[in-house]
Amino acid sequence: MTKMIRESIQKLIDGTNLTYEESLEVMKEVMSGQATSAQIAALLTALRMKGETVEEIIAFAEIMKECSHQIRPRIKGRLVDTCGTGGDKIKTFNISTTAAFVVAGAGVAIAKHGNRSVTSQSGSADVLERLGLNLDMTPEAVQNSVEQVGIGFMFAPAFHPAMKYAIGPRREIGIRTIFNVLGPLTNPACANAQVLGVYDRKLADPLAHALKSLGCEEAMVVHGLDGLDEISTVGKTAIAWLREDEVTTTETVPKDFGVKHARIEEIKGTTPDESAEILFKILNGHCAADDPRREIVLVNAAAGIIVGGKAEDFSYGMELGRKSINSGTAYKKLKALIKASAGNLSKLEELESKYG
């Protein structure tokens, strides 16, 4: 029953890449529950030690997507996901999650795909749940939210039920694996534009090409050279930019965006509760215009606005992001999403009362 995964583990240990076809078959064994937890853990570890190829990643992503509950929001224009692989070296607040609401407030439809933390302190699901979001939305409810609110949140376990077979092994081995990469590549709403933060610069170009093969129209795959899986305002950022069927690579520094160099401690967030409060303060206008946390969100939101087709460059993208926050639209998107999820608005009301 599990001949392929056994053979694949041996090949990987020997340092041999799996073919596209072998990768498809072994992922089918994982997603169907045929592989044991020990076999899955061995496979993930061996893949990580060898280094995943683009072919392996694409094949795994295709099977994972086939096994998911997919939705097809009816929207005009592009549908964007802002997400990261997690596993970065700096424990920041939830930058890409905060940026998603700024992008939505700028008129770009967002299908945010996320999960609880696996290797970091606060996943997107953790922080949004703290703010009152009901994670148990049906696929139909999420589709309606994207169409009517302009943003929806897809809780990975609800949309990827077959992933239950890998949850235990992932948590038990406690290392970054191919699944950190697969989540962002398998958006159940088939988002056709993306800002994808990665924990390793070496992943940027391969994942940009993987997104192209998987049907993405425009994407920025980004890695802060200081260890961030975001566009960094602390130091340099490597960007692999997919547009018009071509992938180009570049490096940026904070001054390219017109923002000051931040210090790492200025963008950290320790707990889901702390990250939730930071997200609230940024969206509700309780951070100064030059607050490093607001600035890094604006830079990353600008990337989402660009791939979403609303801006040609970071300067205009950031201008639209500022308008999204200053007008209150970004915060309204957060409240509307929580309402659409049949969630609890009491946490937001508590924060509104606290900050006046």
Which residue stretches match the model-derived regions?
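N-terminal glycine-rich anion-binding loops that anchor highly charged ligand groups
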Residues: 1-4, 12-58, 66-74, 296
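N-terminal small/glycine-rich loop or linker at the start of catalytic domains
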Residues: 2-13, 79-84, 111
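Glycine-rich anion-binding loops and their surrounding alpha/beta cores
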Residues: 3, 11, 18, 66-69, ...
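Short acidic/histidine-centered micro-motifs embedded in hydrophobic/aromatic stretches
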Residues: 26, 46, 60-63, 320, ...
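Short beta-strand segments at enzyme active-site cores
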Residues: 39-40, 111-113, 221
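Short amphipathic alpha-helical face segments that pack within enzyme cores
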Residues: 42, 98-102, 296, 300-303
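A glycine-rich phosphate/pyrophosphate-binding beta-strand-loop-alpha-helix module
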Residues: 44, 93-149
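Active-site cofactor/substrate anionic-group-binding motifs, chiefly glycine-
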Residues: 51-117
